């Protein structure tokens, strides 16, 4: 599946938010790249809404067409469209692997999933966009447990807090999905209502 593979720091600087997590290059220069990066740009309502959508897309590594499908699905569901959209994005398997601390970044998590290192309820899944459900059980495959990414993940367990809707169990790094997250459990620097306003036009 197509995806953005360019420099993440450049995107972070353009959008004004760390899309990677712990990006030291962004922390040093948190303004847009280029000769006029520090210059003030007049913000229009449309620009602000578009920028918020781009932040969400690049945070979760989703292309425009798929992001629009997620929005349309969220809009059909009961409740707040913005909350529904974030819940859909958070339930992607690559994001769950990242949230559980088994990968340093979502991009790394996407790669681990694509390479077939995980099973969901006993079935191998290698599709990063696969959507988990409440009570799903995600396991690292036996042959993958002693590879470098998972050894490092065990050694650094606890460095990053795991959200309460997930639980990681034991040396096997089993992930239990207790529920799908509520908005208060999703710590992303997004104003999802701006995305809703953009697509509602």
From Swiss-Prot:
One GO-annotated biological process of the protein: translation
Keyword rRNA-binding appears in the UniProt entry: yes
Keyword Oxidoreductase applies: no
Record-linked CDD domains: S4 (cd00165)
Keywords in alphabetical order: Ribonucleoprotein, Ribosomal protein, RNA-binding, rRNA-binding
Region (Disordered): 1-38
GO molecular function, one term: rRNA binding
GO cellular component: small ribosomal subunit
Domain annotation S4 RNA-binding: ranges: 91-157
Family: Belongs to the universal ribosomal protein uS4 family.
Subunit structure: Part of the 30S ribosomal subunit. Contacts protein S5. The interaction surface between S4 and S5 is involved in control of translational fidelity.
Name listed for the protein in its UniProt record: Small ribosomal subunit protein uS4
Source species of the chain: Mycobacterium sp. (strain KMS)
